[in-house]
Amino acid sequence: MKNKFAVILFLVLIVVAGGHFSCAEPNFTYSTPKDYVFKPSLDEDSSGERILFIVDFSNSMNERLGHRTKLDIALSTMKEILQMIPAHTAVGLRVYGHKTGFTPKQSCTASDLVSPVQKNNAVNIYTRLNSINAVGWTPITYALKQAAYFDFPDTTGKKRIILISDGGENCDESPCDFIIELMKYREDIRIDVIALAIGDEDANNQLKCVALVTSGKFYNANTAAELKNSLQDSLNLQKEVQGVIIDTNK
């Protein structure tokens, strides 16, 4: 009887304790980089590279390069390139400088993901490109931050950004400094940069840094043909015209 009573008392104690009678679970601590956003993996194959175009729609894209505006050259070239990208490749589009604000802060946060990274997306990207006006500033760093933290559909697999800009950062930030910090904990992003007729040395150096630090490529494109070739090389598509490619490893 004593043994039976002891067993019953033991079970009652377990119930009253709410399970705390068992060994305590170990405590784990972890930390994540500032502003980093976790997104769960999707069911689709995560081994393929995701590609995000970031295109400059600042007011200076309305300037002429030869007989056409830089914006017209960029749009017509993108139309050709998008038709060459396989449908199974996940691509997306972010733009900046497409709107102005009443304050510098508003102008320096003028960047939007207008077409999320996904497969079979070429037509939608081109449609969005042709619906946007070039009117604002050049918040490159803000655009890169948004792209790195929010624009890719999951946290696995390789991610590539192709940045097309006709000028350097004109907000109070440094794309080079941001990328150096980002690469301390992110090794999954590569950035190719195409400088569209940029004559300013400091601006070029900032953009070269972005490519170099991420093991990407930097291109100088001063004509429509060179822009097309730069995009083809970046995307590993068949090249037709030899452009000017800068080796960032020198």
Feature annotation, model-predicted:
Residues 30-42:
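A short, compositionally biased domain-edge/stem linker segment
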Residues 70-87, 93:
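An active-site-proximal "capping" alpha-helix that borders the catalytic cofactor pocket
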Residues 20-22:
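C-terminal motif of bacterial Sec signal peptides marking the signal peptidase cleavage site
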